[in-house]
């Protein structure tokens, strides 16, 4: 292999990690989406209802406001007409989002700089919730 080919190969492998690191978009601002949820038991503050005999399907409009971001770490609020949760989160190097609030956890994916999918799970002796919401950043 020629000296030039070695230099090009080295340059490509040196730049790739830096490019991957800078791929994290600016998430600050307001995001909105409609959940697709399934709930057993009384649910949680957002999906509250009288317990049914079996699982029930539910959809809720959510707003997420991200007010702090430092690289891969961010925090803010996740709200609906029924509740408000403070959230903290981190983005993995592969673009996965790991988020927690006071009663459950969320795993998500950055789909585009202005779109993400967040899937929330809660399990307790009284209630279970599984919910996915595609969030779109508002202008």
Regions found by a protein language model. Give the residues of each.
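Bacterial N-terminal signal peptides
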Residues: 6-15
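Predominantly extracellular/secreted and cell-surface proteins with exposed
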Residues: 57-103
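Sec/Tat signal peptide C-region and signal peptidase I cleavage site
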Residues: 16-20
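Positively charged n-region of N-terminal signal peptides that target proteins for export
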Residues: 1-5
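Short, flexible, glycine/charge-rich loop motifs used to bind or transfer phosphoryl groups or to couple energy/partner
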Residues: 21-22, 87
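Short, solvent-exposed loop/hinge segments that bridge or flank secondary-structure elements
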Residues: 22-75, 126-136
